Amino acid sequence: MKKKIFAVLMLALLVTACSSSKKVIKNTGVGVDSANKYAIEDTEANKKPLEDIIVFDQEGVTIRREGNNLILSMPELILFDFDKYAVKDGIKPSLATLAKALGENKDIHIKIDGYTDFIGTEAYNLELSVKRARAIKDFLISKGAIGSNISIEGYGEQNPADTNKTEAGRSRNRRVEFIISRG
């Protein structure tokens, strides 16, 4: 009988000796504990959708999804004068909004595609379309976008958005389009 009581006491002592006095709190967050501050791990699950980040309320701006990318275009806004690549004042507020979103979301990358109307040589239009894309990139950077997250490409007169038979159509073809994606 004494052996049984002794065995039970030893077992109880062994169980209490193996228990920890630390409190475990489960499901408190993901990340590293540093003085009770948690760094949330940046996972796909907790990222906002691109549509919630890239938001415009200006007329003439269209945003559509193609696969994992957003395509932002401004078909109703005249972005560039004939044979010019200077960014027009009327579009600067929208571009500043885009730059702010890009600066605040470092994982977002953007490709700027520049276009021209069909007047001029193919080589000249290709060069002009690159200058237009670069002018937009430079403006975005000046307003807080991260330059290394922006690429540019010129397409000249390829892929017209409108007819080249009228001045109004040619004006809409002098444009850039933005392909926005997660990096």
Task: Annotate each PLM feature.
Residues L14-A17:
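C-terminal motif of bacterial Sec signal peptides marking the signal peptidase cleavage site
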Residues K100-Y124:
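A short, charged
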Residues K22-K106, G183:
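Periplasmic peptidoglycan-binding/tethering modules of Gram-negative envelope proteins
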Residues M1-K4:
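Positively charged n-region of N-terminal signal peptides that target proteins for export
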Residues Y115-G183:
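Periplasmic OmpA-like peptidoglycan-binding domain that tethers envelope proteins to the cell wall
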Residues I71-S73, H109-K111, S151, E177-F178:
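Structural recognition of the beta-strand scaffold that forms the well-ordered cores
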